[in-house]
Structures are given as C-alpha cells and as structure tokens.
Amino acid sequence: MDGILNIFKPIGLTSFDVVRQVKKISKEKKVGHTGTLDPLASGVLPICIGKATKIVDFVMEGKKIYDAEMKLGEISDTYDREGKILKVNQVTSSENNIVEAIMSFQGEILQVPPMYSALKVNGIKLYDLARQGIEIERASRKIHIYAIKILSIDIPFVKFRVECSKGTYIRSLCYDIGNKLGCGALMYNLTRVSSGNFNSSFSIPLEDLNEQNITENIINVDKCLENYDEIAVDEKFEKLLVNGVKVSDRRLIEKIPDNKTYRVYNMERKFLGLGNLSEEGFKIIKLLT
C-alpha cells in the first residue's frame, strides 16, 4: 500500500497517535506524518504510507491555512490555554487597535519558536528542556504570513484565518500579537484547514477510517505532487534514471526548460519519481517506482 491519506485529526491526539492508528489499520510498517499538529489542535494531517514516506519533505513544503482563536490578556508557558498561566492583564485595546496589530504581522517576518515545541537544539527537543524548567535562547526563523483574515472579535477572544509558510507556529504568532498590544495573548483553539494540496473539505475523520475504507481513501503519490510540473522520458532514459544515473544527453535536457524539480513518468504514464535538473544533467532525486 503506497500513497497518502488526508486525515482530519481530532483534538486530544498527538500526530504520532494518528500514525500509530493508521499503522494498525493499514498493517503497514512505513507510515509517517507530514507536519506536527499539537494535541490541542484539530485539522488536516496528511499521512504517508509505504513508498510515500520518501516524499514527506516535499509534501510538507506547501502553504498552510489555519483557523485560530486567540485569547487576549493571558500569558502561559506553552503559549496556549493548556499551559501554566504566568500572567493575567486587562485588555484595554480597541477593536481597531487589535485589527491593526494582527494585520501588521503579514509578510516575511522573523519568529521565535516556543520552548514547548519539537524543535531540537544539540539533539535535545525543546519541550524536553521546558519540562525540566529549563529555558534557552532560541534563534528566530524567517517565516512568511501570506494573508490574515479577521473572522470575529469578542474581546478577549479573537478568531482569525492565517495563510502561512511551513514552520510557522500559530502559538508564537498569538504570543507576539499579545506582546505588541501590551496585554499578552495565548492560542485558545486551532484548526488546520489545509496543508499544501490537502484540504479539510476532502479529508476523512480519523475515527471513520477502517480496514474496509482505507484503500478507497488513499491518494496516489503523484497526485499529491501536482504542484510540480511533469515530464515524460523514453525507455532508454528511463533505464538510466531509475538506476541513479545523471543524464546529460541533450535529447533529454532540451525537453526540460527549467532547473527545478519535476514529476517524472515513462511513456506508459508510470510514475517514476521526482527528478531535478542541474548544470551536470538530469537525475531522479526520489525514486518511487
């Protein structure tokens, strides 16, 4: 069984809980998720099975869309409502000031990840240090907030939709917005609406997945990579490429316009994998045949 499941994760489970359940249902050993969702969060969690686990990094590259609910006036150690409340402040900002502060985070920004995260420093996960009461300085990371839409404001609660790059922490975004307003804030609820090509409208709730319907819900690997252009290669080049040879023959190179990643098919429309063109030639970088 090779492909990707568009799972809708319920609140209360970790991403690895979902992986374990899919392993049990599919009876497959190779199963992996494509981007952690906190237990507090629900939403789209693409799960790769079999050979699809080879392309986890490529699936994770896509933009993410979240529906977030933020509570102003409270600060917690985890940046969400499940953590220890460290401070409570009065919210004095007007709705206009709140909107202005939120919208100022659009564009390319630097974000410091929360201590309670799976990021590693010197091989140790940050949340393992945080649980020991250790806080260390974290380097800021460049992220992109493509769009923010305010859904509702009922002070101290604010609901908004965020379209962002991978690696964005909505908990940190809420914390930073609260910091800018001077009252603090924490993430109260979160739903991932989409992740790359995967949307909640076409997802299957984890609790509905079973041995009978898993096959009909699995998506072919190449269909999940439709954001990459495709090329077809003839039999001669196919044999070279699947054996790891970097092909510099101009009869192939001239068919490939740009130095970027492509979906590669043979002439019978069999998906071979992902290939990349460089100055030295064209090569399969992820073989999936």
Swiss-Prot record:
<dbReference type="InterPro" id="IPR014780">
    <property type="entry name" value="tRNA_psdUridine_synth_TruB"/>
</dbReference>
<keyword id="KW-0413">Isomerase</keyword>
<keyword id="KW-0819">tRNA processing</keyword>
<comment type="similarity">
    <text>Belongs to the pseudouridine synthase TruB family. Type 1 subfamily.</text>
</comment>
<dbReference type="GO" id="GO:1990481">
    <property type="term" value="P:mRNA pseudouridine synthesis"/>
</dbReference>
<dbReference type="Pfam" id="PF01509">
    <property type="entry name" value="TruB_N"/>
</dbReference>
<dbReference type="InterPro" id="IPR002501">
    <property type="entry name" value="PsdUridine_synth_N"/>
</dbReference>
<dbReference type="GO" id="GO:0160148">
    <property type="term" value="F:tRNA pseudouridine(55) synthase activity"/>
</dbReference>
<dbReference type="Pfam" id="PF16198">
    <property type="entry name" value="TruB_C_2"/>
</dbReference>
<dbReference type="GO" id="GO:0031119">
    <property type="term" value="P:tRNA pseudouridine synthesis"/>
</dbReference>
<dbReference type="GO" id="GO:0003723">
    <property type="term" value="F:RNA binding"/>
</dbReference>
<comment type="function">
    <text>Responsible for synthesis of pseudouridine from uracil-55 in the psi GC loop of transfer RNAs.</text>
</comment>
<feature type="active site" description="Nucleophile">
    <location>
        <position position="38"/>
    </location>
</feature>
<protein>
    <recommendedName>
        <fullName>tRNA pseudouridine synthase B</fullName>
        <ecNumber>5.4.99.25</ecNumber>
    </recommendedName>
</protein>
<dbReference type="InterPro" id="IPR032819">
    <property type="entry name" value="TruB_C"/>
</dbReference>
<dbReference type="InterPro" id="IPR020103">
    <property type="entry name" value="PsdUridine_synth_cat_dom_sf"/>
</dbReference>
